[in-house]
Amino acid sequence: MKKIIVYSVLFLMATIQNVSSQTKVLGKWKTIDDDTGAAKSIVEIYESNGKIYGKVLQILEKGKEDKVCEECKGDKKNKPIKGMVIIYGLTKNDDEWDGGKILDPKSGKEYKCVISLENENKLKVRGYVGFSLLGRTQYWTRVKE
């Protein structure tokens, strides 16, 4: 009987930790320009139907607040970047979220995507083609509310 209780408690703790780690990536994140180090936008990471998505809430670059995605394809072509979902379809895989895509609004190109927490306030976002080694990594910072 004691073993059943111990295993039940351990299972419950593992489940709570898994849910807690997933919710830690949720929230608002400030994206940083690779070249200048300046803040570019605020992206909200949210969950829908068990998958992770990211939507541009705000453009921080002066004069680009109303920019459209000129290089995008399909239904995103010439649509405002503000309000656009740029990360979609990520699922939890151990300590990462992968299996989805990220859109670079500057080039209009889509890449495979993997995200993970470096720490409570730093999100590692990697876009790549083919293998994860062939890609680019950005670090986003959590927006304090």
Mark where each language-model region is.
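Bacterial Sec-dependent N-terminal signal peptides
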Residues: 1-24
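K/E-rich alpha-helical interaction surfaces of small helical-bundle regulatory domains
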Residues: 23-38, 138-145
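Short, hydrophobic/aromatic-rich segments at coil-to-beta transitions
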Residues: 23-28, 93-100, 121-124
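Central antiparallel beta-sheet cores of small beta-barrel/beta-sandwich binding domains
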Residues: 33, 38-103, 110-111
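Short polar/acidic secondary-structure junctions
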Residues: 34-36, 105, 116, 130-131
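Well-ordered beta-strand positions
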Residues: 46, 91, 116-117, 141
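Edge beta-strand at a domain terminus
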Residues: 120-122, 129-145
